[in-house]
A protein has these predicted regions:
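Zinc-dependent deaminase
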Residues: 1-22, 84-160
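Conserved hydrophobic/aromatic pocket- or pore-lining residues that grip, position, or stack substrates
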Residues: 12, 28, 60
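Short, basic and Ser/Thr-rich N-terminal targeting/leader segments
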Residues: 23-27, 74
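Short beta-strand scaffold segments in enzyme catalytic cores
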Residues: 27-36
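A short acidic/small-residue loop/turn micro-motif
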Residues: 45-48
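Helix-adjacent hinge/juxtasegments
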Residues: 50-54, 58-95
Length: 160
């Protein structure tokens, strides 16, 4: 882990907190270029936009591609508060991201070892992966969110 990982993961956590405030599953992501500049950010928006594809990673990748004018993000690092799901892991492969740093593990849908490891397959792009960065903090925001969600009446799951 490089010393900047914690700094950037804190930024991703801020995006997760913004998602939680809008009733979204609190996952945040940022993409950083080789010089350490934040290129883009994303947070879950599936509920708000009624779109299953709008995960934090996908939004951050889309914004980075638009900002950089390229679909290859080969000099970039993605920071995300939770282990990517299969859809997001596929987008990471396709966008050629150089490195992925994630916070907590996803025992239900994690694609980097928690459920299966997409990275073990002979795909056309390999990249560095580091998990468990600020794991407790990243897991806590999710636990708190779902504990609060379970307290709400059944019909009001997406209301704040």
């Amino acid at each position: 882990m490089i010393k900047d990982d914690i700094y950037y993961m804190k930024k991703a956590l801020a995006r997760a907190k913004a998602a939680a405030k809008q009733g979204e599953v609190p996952i945040g992501a940022i993409i950083v270029d080789k010089d350490g500049n934040i290129v883009s950010t994303g947070r879950n928006m599936s509920e708000l936009q009624k779109n299953a594809l709008h995960h934090a990673e996908i939004i951050a990748i889309d914004r980075a591609c638009k900002k950089l004018g390229a679909w290859r993000l080969s000099d970039c690092t993605l920071y995300v508060t939770m282990e990517p799901c299969p859809m997001c892991a596929g987008a990471i492969v396709n966008s050629r991201i150089k490195r992925v740093v994630y916070g907590c593990f996803d025992k239900k849908a994690g694609a980097y070892g928690s459920v299966f490891n997409l990275h073990e397959y002979p795909l056309n792009h390999k990249y560095e992966i580091e998990g468990g960065v600020m794991e407790r903090e990243c897991a806590a925001i999710l636990s708190d969110f779902f504990a609060e969600l379970r307290k709400r009446p059944k019909g009001n799951k997406n209301e704040n």
